[in-house]
Amino acid sequence: MTTVSSDRIRIKLKAYDYRILDKAVAEIVDTARNTGAGVAGPIPLPTNIHKFTVNRSVHVDKKSREQFEMRIHKRLMDILEPTQQTVDALGKLSLPAGVDVEIKL
């Protein structure tokens, strides 16, 4: 078994919808375990909530406002002792649209 130079691969995933984020995490975990690497996580990180308040009307009624929010869900996971086969399989993996992936070796 040839291992990659580092001891782990750290993967940070972000998405607006937690359901597609969990599907992406499940695919990564299955791929890593099928190639013989260990997996630590997924660790749910705090959700960022961006709130926007706007006036409902254009000119009057300052008291009438509407609030919108944007939630960014995040997960962190480590692939422990990855092999070259693990790195190749993760590179070929197609994840759902809307998932932002950051990989650190």
Swiss-Prot record:
GO biological process: translation
InterPro entries named among the record's database cross-references: Ribosomal_uS10, Ribosomal_uS10_CS, Ribosomal_uS10_dom, Ribosomal_uS10_dom_sf
Keywords, comma-separated and alphabetical: Ribonucleoprotein, Ribosomal protein
Matches recorded under Pfam families: Ribosomal_S10
Stored SMART domains: Ribosomal_S10 (SM01403)
One GO MF term attached to the UniProt entry: tRNA binding
Residue pairs linked by disulfide bridges in the UniProt entry: none
GO cellular component: ribonucleoprotein complex; ribosome
Subunit structure: Part of the 30S ribosomal subunit.
Function: Involved in the binding of tRNA to the ribosomes.
HAMAP family, sorted: Ribosomal_uS10
Family recorded in the similarity comment: Belongs to the universal ribosomal protein uS10 family.
PANTHER family: 30S RIBOSOMAL PROTEIN S10 FAMILY MEMBER (PTHR11700)
Protein name per Swiss-Prot or TrEMBL: Small ribosomal subunit protein uS10
Organism: Oleidesulfovibrio alaskensis (strain ATCC BAA-1058 / DSM 17464 / G20) (Desulfovibrio alaskensis)
The organism's taxonomic lineage, starting at the top: Bacteria, Pseudomonadati, Thermodesulfobacteriota, Desulfovibrionia, Desulfovibrionales
